[in-house]
Amino acid sequence: MARPVQLAPGSLALVLCRLEAQKAAGAAEEPGGRAVFRAFRRANARCFWNARLARAASRLAFQGWLRRGVLLVRAPPACLQVLRDAWRRRALRPPRGFRIRAVGDVFPVQMNPITQSQFVPLGEVLCCAISDMNTAQIVVTQESLLERLMKHYPGIAIPSEDILYTTLGTLIKERKIYHTGEGYFIVTPQTYFITNTTTQENKRMLPSDESRLMPASMTYLVSMESCAESAQENAAPISHCQSCQCFRDMHTQDVQEAPVAAEVTRKSHRGLGESVSWVQNGAVSVSAEHHICESTKPLPYTRDKEKGKKFGFSLLWRSLSRKEKPKTEHSSFSAQFPPEEWPVRDEDDLDNIPRDVEHEIIKRINPILTVDNLIKHTVLMQKYEEQKKYNSQGTSTDMLTIGHKYPSKEGVKKRQGLSAKPQGQGHSRRDRHKARNQGSEFQPGSIRLEKHPKLPATQPIPRIKSPNEMVGQKPLGEITTVLGSHLIYKKRISNPFQGLSHRGSTISKGHKIQKTSDLKPSQTGPKEKPFQKPRSLDSSRIFDGKAKEPYAEQPNDKMEAESIYINDPTVKPINDDFRGHLFSHPQQSMLQNDGKCCPFMESMLRYEVYGGENEVIPEVLRKSHSHFDKLGETKQTPHSLPSRGASFSDRTPSACRLVDNTIHQFQNLGLLDYPVGVNPLRQAARQDKDSEELLRKGFVQDAETTSLENEQLSNDDQALYQNEVEDDDGACSSLYLEEDDISENDDLRQMLPGHSQYSFTGGSQGNHLGKQKVIERSLTEYNSTMERVESQVLKRNECYKPTGLHATPGESQEPNLSAESCGLNSGAQFGFNYEEEPSVAKCVQASAPADERIFDYYSARKASFEAEVIQDTIGDTGKKPASWSQSPQNQEMRKHFPQKFQLFNTSHMPVLAQDVQYEHSHLEGTENHSMAGDSGIDSPRTQSLGSNNSVILDGLKRRQNFLQNVEGTKSSQPLTSNSLLPLTPVINV
């Protein structure tokens, strides 16, 4: 501890008191210490009679003057001793107007010094520096502050920028300083917190009312000292931190005299009671929602008033444009202070940054990340999720096939794109049921797919796709697009059309899709579905939907549940190629040459769909399916026939309606050769419903007979199918016939009045309407025709039983034209794939579900080539349904073979012919699928592809020959498998 320091030596103190008279006289002014000292020395210096006293008085020095009349004098010790002696003897004279009350010695004044530490707090130094700079009207920035520290505080180590930034932030939190766009300022008594709790009603309060707001909580800092804001108009804006966005246009207030500032401070603490004082003193009362700003100057009151008016209402309280607004003494300023951009900390949580400031910081860091961009991004992500969900539904088993997912307006592109996409294995019954219920109305002009609602499978309603889709796809032989994965992979070896786009004319949409499916052999399993036509396109598509599902993979229960998937568990599955092919074909695909073998299934399906009563049909379908799978086992199909016969009567009305609808659709498309009014089906239906009932009964009987005969024929049929399967390897190299050829075949079909291809939505155009009326019409319409055919059939062969069933199993083997399909077909559209085997004339009448199923003539392997050619043509035709009636070749074919068509249109086609046709259609369908690409070495695919026209012509010629042969057989010769086999080679190319 330091030694005590003597502040003053020993002295003599004189305690004086004023005289009464002097008090009265000199009350106005109080004499000072020096004046009293001079008066005291003069009075004693005149004591000439006491030379020692006079000499000592002259040597006195003024030590100090203490209030209450204490005079401290010092002099050499001898002189002080003389004064002591004079006071003892009462000889010491007082100064004028005073009297001496006491005299005494005062000890020397001593002080113990206090040592200082060497630590200098940076915060204090920064505050001092900022205060000095504010006083000097220097803009305080981090750079200028460092310079001042180096210059005026040499004893302090210069802090780094990071330390300086951190220290300043701490001072702001402690409210020792605050930051604005013009720099840092010291928080002084004139700087106060503005309340942020003013209500909406207080926004326009006058300054006199501001006192009410003061007690509220404080949030923001505002300096009322003009000196702290003066001389900064031209100063460059400076931000405290990178995240801070401050106003660049802040105007500083003029410098104020210290007394005025003090007065303002006092008044602000008193509640800001008088508006005049606010204007004069330049107090700034800024609330979060209501700010009253006046600038003060040391000018007269009027000058201050004008200055206050210049602060008009504006969004920025320091905006450059000071527009004068007529106001009274003060002008209200509605804006938040400090602005939202300022990084003001929250009162409660010092670490909390206001939301707006955070937004500004985010903008500084990542300008792209804005609210708008976030909203857009959110919308895009939502769309993406929806689309993803949409696509995921495409692969789900519960979703319908392509056609249902996409609206018709997107028809071609979406369907084609979907054909490439793998579909879910199967559509749930519910979805199929919905699809059936919601089949869109047919629009003759448009072939684009309608966005079809899912059809619940539970309803017996025929599964009919939208007429547009039906038109586009049913006739298009798109059924072939549903080829089994195995069959497709064979074609995959060399697919000349692999790279072709599927965006052809909308009319040939189904056709192109079929090609696509064929062309995309690589896709198997669920991917086969995309190739298939949307279920909305044709009811047989329901069956197709099954086929679309990887048949090997699809559970039989689904098929059975639909009664559409005709898997016979007892029958070992045929090549998946055939199976997929069969299923890929619409049930009446026989008509569409895609589902040659499916017609039987389709008929069964229709039976199930329309009758909805006969549960035996599913088994029949399964058997037929297994039969198809085996390709050689037609036995199961015949066995299943009996059940169909039983249910046929139920299905007949719906079939008739479907036929009627189909005819109407065909008329709209210009596919029918005769006007709708001329349609014998409709006339017959309208004229004679009794005959229709008779037909139904006849069909039932025929179905029964067929079932019996089919049982007999099953063995032979299986053998025949097996042979055909063996031949199928070679036959698989099916020719790819052009659409013209197919169209011709289709034309032939159309020529058949009853043959408004009833392949349910899948195979028959009548299904486009998705109504059973077509069947009814065809039934009624062809009562007479059926009768003629029946008579002819009876004449033709024993096999042709009155019921239309062929008794001999041998006959049924190859022809395998189920009487049911024939008979039903007569009532229903005569789904007569005349293209495939003119001889067989595929009397596939979609109307007769059971008969139709059988109706496809599944010719032997040899016939398969013919079938392929025909199917190719048919498939193409199906793809281009409009071309059926239009192509001259088709017309010519119609001219040449009207009788043949009628013959096959008859509902009572022999079961033998049906079986043959069924087999032929099955083989044909297989070959047709292989047309896109076939592994067979002998496949004429390349030739047929290279010269489709020549192939078509040859096919037509062969068909003509075949028809002639059929006529010959028609005389009375039974169409035995032996007789049919020789005919089939004629069609082979």
UniProtKB/Swiss-Prot annotation:
Residues 526-556 have a biased composition (Basic and acidic residues). This is Storkhead-box protein 1. GO terms for cellular component: cell cortex; centrosome; cytoplasm; cytosol; fibrillar center; nucleoplasm; nucleus. Residues 327-346, 389-470, 497-556, 631-651, 926-948 are annotated as: Disordered. The keyword Cell division applies. Involved in regulating the levels of reactive oxidative species and reactive nitrogen species and in mitochondrial homeostasis in the placenta. Required for regulation of inner ear epithelial cell proliferation via the AKT signaling pathway. Residues 427-436 have a biased composition (Basic residues). It is linked to Pre-eclampsia/eclampsia 4: A hypertensive disorder of pregnancy characterized by new hypertension (blood pressure 140/90 or greater) presenting after 20 weeks' gestation with clinically relevant proteinuria. It impacts 2 individuals, the mother and her child, both of whom can be severely affected. Preeclampsia is one of the causes of maternal mortality and morbidity worldwide. Residues 390-399, 497-508 have a biased composition (Polar residues). PANTHER family: STORKHEAD-BOX PROTEIN 1, WINGED HELIX DOMAIN-CONTAINING PROTEIN. Keywords: Activator, Cell cycle, Cell division, Cytoplasm, Cytoskeleton, Disease variant, DNA-binding, Mitosis, Nucleus, Transcription, Transcription regulation. One of its GO terms (molecular function) is DNA-binding transcription factor activity. Expressed in placenta, including the invasive extravillus trophoblast cells.
